[in-house]
Amino acid sequence: MDIRRFKGDLYELAGKACCDDSEEVRLNVFAIADILVNLYRKNLVKINHSALELVCARALIKQGYEVKVEHRLDKILVCDVIGSRGDERLIVEIETGFIPPEAALEPSGYARNRISSKIARYSRYADKFALGTTPSYTLDVPRFFVKPPRDRTREEATQIKTLIDVVYNEPEISVDDLIQAVLHMVFVIDVDSTNVQEIDARTYDRMALSVLDWHRTVQGLNPR
């Protein structure tokens, strides 16, 4: 564990991101960096994930949100980034497509199930829920979560629940929870430039379609 390097990297990133920001924004962003450094000392975070959280947090701070990172929601769930502005609560969960060794033979299914699990479990704690990802990764979000809840069926929700429960079963998610779970936005987080692009979920779905259409066809998934 190289705490000095971790802190140096985050401070360098924070300084680069905030070079033209107000002093208030700078102070808040560096405070987030310090929180992440303390979590790194406890071996709770890694630099690649922390860099994405920092850049995302800075974008929300600039929009007037009061931001926290690695915030505990209940006894089990800790969200990556949460922002509060007035009565609005926004949660952003980072998803980079990491596949553990045990899922090496079914990486696409594992990634899709993890994305579904994050939307189902975290969105109920937020007024708006977003997934944060990198420009080099395309999120394979089941269209179920992009459709309005009124257009979903219990059969669809049951299918999603079966897939999620294979990988994640705590906290338990009901079919009713799934019907209400919504992905509102995708945050494309470019650490290199320290910029964040916010895309509404339906627009992202259309953008991703050309990339994912063949992939879904060969996997035998339902047409979108």
Predicted regions and their residues:
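Non-catalytic C-terminal interaction segments of nucleic acid-processing enzymes
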Residues: 2-30, 40, 136-224
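Acidic-basic catalytic patches of nuclease active cores, encompassing PD-(D/E)XK
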Residues: 15-72
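Short glycine/proline-enriched coil/turn segments at helix->beta-strand junctions
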Residues: 65, 86-88, 124-129
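Catalytic micro-motifs at enzyme active sites that drive phosphoryl/nucleotidyl and oxygen chemistry
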Residues: 68-72, 78-80, 118-119, 174-175
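A structural signal for short, well-ordered beta-strand segments and their strand-loop junctions
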Residues: 68-69, 91-93, 130-133
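Residue-level "edge-of-site" marker
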Residues: 72-73, 135
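Active-site beta-strand-loop-beta-strand hairpin of nuclease catalytic cores
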Residues: 75, 79-100
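Catalytic cores of nucleic-acid endonucleases
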Residues: 96-153
